[in-house]
Amino acid sequence: MIQTHSEVKRVEELRRLLQQASYAYYVSDAPIMEDAVYDQLYRELQQLEIQHPELVTPDSPTQRIGERPATQFLSVRHNIPLYSLENAFNVEELQAWDQRWRRQVAPTEAEYVAELKIDGSAIALTYQNGILVRGATRGDGVTGEDITQNVRTIRSIPLRLNFDGIEKVEKVEVRGEAFLPLEVFKQINEERQKAGEQLFANPRNAAAGTLRQLDSRIVARRRLDFFAYTLHISGMDDASIANTQWEALELLQKMGFRVNPNHKLCQSLAEVADYYKYWDTERLNLPYMTDGVVLKLNSFKLQEQLGFTQRFPRWAVALKYPAEEAPTRVENIAVNVGRTGALTPLAQMRPVQLAGTTVSRATLHNSDRIAQLDIRIGDTVIVRKAGEIIPEVVRVIKELRPADTQPFIMPTHCPVCGQPVVRETGEAVTRCVNASCPAILKGSIEHWVSRDALDIKGVGEKLVYQLVDKGLVHSVADLYDLTTERLFALERMGEKSAQKLIEAIAQSKNQPWSRVLYGLGIRHVGSVNAQLLSEKYRAVAELSSAKQSDIEGIYGIGAEIAQSVYQWFRINANQSLIERLQAAGLKLANTEEIPVMNNGILKLNGKTFVVTGTLPTLKRDEVKALIQKAGGKVTDSVSKKTDYLVVGEDAGSKLEKAQALGIAQLTETQLLEILEE
């Protein structure tokens, strides 16, 4: 189809509007456009590009997420090496670094730029004539991997630089840190835990692993963020080039990058030391991980004079915070069996205080990790924990190893049911594949009754264990065959308790199809994925008969999830389970229409809510469901992006923060009035 002049102009205008909106939302944290308007403009641009593929450009907002997974990452050589930084661990070592560089040059006054050291993964970005053409991992500093397709999904990285005259610049290279905000990291691990997947040990590992995903759709879902900190420009008039690190940070912001707002220009090492001490405690309140302070000489002229060693720039140093580490003794290595059959080794240790909590257990993940550490019962180990990170064994102090220790070997049979275990090709996890294994059954029932699934009140771990051990339940479908008489066989189960439990189980039949789908515990399917699947396939019959390729085509569903769902419905026992649940009266189809206003827009579309305190009549989950049903979003913490705070009795710090930010507050009654208008 031949494009008209007006269509070309419209495409250019749409790109400009969408790029401005993305910058305002993801970089400036000051939205200028409603989500619904953004979506409408995005769809219009997408449609025009489909009709006129010759108009598609690499910097178009539609090109952030690739259609197909990559098959491999290609090695690329960095134009300018990404050096490591020399480390200092206290103020004395910082002073020693300062004395070393001063011996290299004539006596001079110097300014320092102090920046928080973000605990993520370094990446290098290359722009030609203002357009992003390459993103690469740090690698060994000389050679990295081309991850351009994944870098495009990071919304705080501009696809086109926002700076007058930048399109005439031959090449711009930007370095920075890709990282996972703590709230996002927590959500990802919760999803992985519910889906029976191995948890990420910390946000840094999660960020690095995400950047190396072959499927950019998975990268997009994980919502990486980015702070820029280094700028190299070629082909630009000298007068326009920054002469100091401070000016470079300002220029990066003008170009459209997020720069960490907590950097400081210091006139002395004493100022640097104060900055370091301040953030040693304040960093715990940040929404991302930081493990130190990076100090750079501000003057580029001075940096050029000092140059580099074989490994480090002489003009910069990383002043690290001491890690939360402590030695302790491994008293036992237990092996747990999860609801997906995964065998997870667990180090049981002598209790030790770390990050304000008592740590006595740490996951060892799998047999590969055990072999890597060469950890044994009786070993003295260094265990680490910082903030909300999962406790991990960092290393074994082999000099303190008792003479009679033996290498730990993962069991060849399930420690619960005794059946042989398997380790599939390409997987690090060993699994019990016995569908009747009590551990798998108990885990699947706990998952079924959990808050995000069928939300059956009064069914905790102890009751689940009793139901399985007494032979009353052999699958989740058996819950719907329970009677008060049969429940009397359980310990501490009176008539009133039994009746309440039967009522709670019956009430779960009203839960929507998306929750039932999540409750089935299909591997890799978390609550968000279940929602996506249930929106596409509005009944179980549609999903069970869907082709794997069609499932994979859903935005947000990758190849791994699609394969898992497709294979689950091919198993006869699972088909029988679906039939029993259907016969029991559970909702295996969407029956409600999506509520819309007269103009077709959801009432709360694009609005972000936070709920605090105890509401008069509604539970928090009920409020969340009402808001989401009307197109709104509910988050756990108050920020500049929050539109409304729904306030109940005994509201705490969230109310204070909302008042400080000038965020509107609603009572339960006011919220219901908005929904009923």
From Swiss-Prot:
Catalytic residues as annotated in Swiss-Prot or TrEMBL: 117 (n6-amp-lysine intermediate)
One GO CC term on file: cytosol
All residue ranges annotated as the BRCT domain in the record: 599-677
Example GO BP: DNA repair
Group of enzyme by EC: ligase
Alphabetical list of PROSITE patterns matching this protein: BRCT, DNA_LIGASE_N1, DNA_LIGASE_N2
Task of the protein: DNA ligase that catalyzes the formation of phosphodiester linkages between 5'-phosphoryl and 3'-hydroxyl groups in double-stranded DNA using NAD as a coenzyme and as the energy source for the reaction. It is essential for DNA replication and repair of damaged DNA.
Family per record: Belongs to the NAD-dependent DNA ligase family. LigA subfamily.
Name of the protein in question: DNA ligase
Species in which this protein is naturally found: Nostoc sp. (strain PCC 7120 / SAG 25.82 / UTEX 2576)
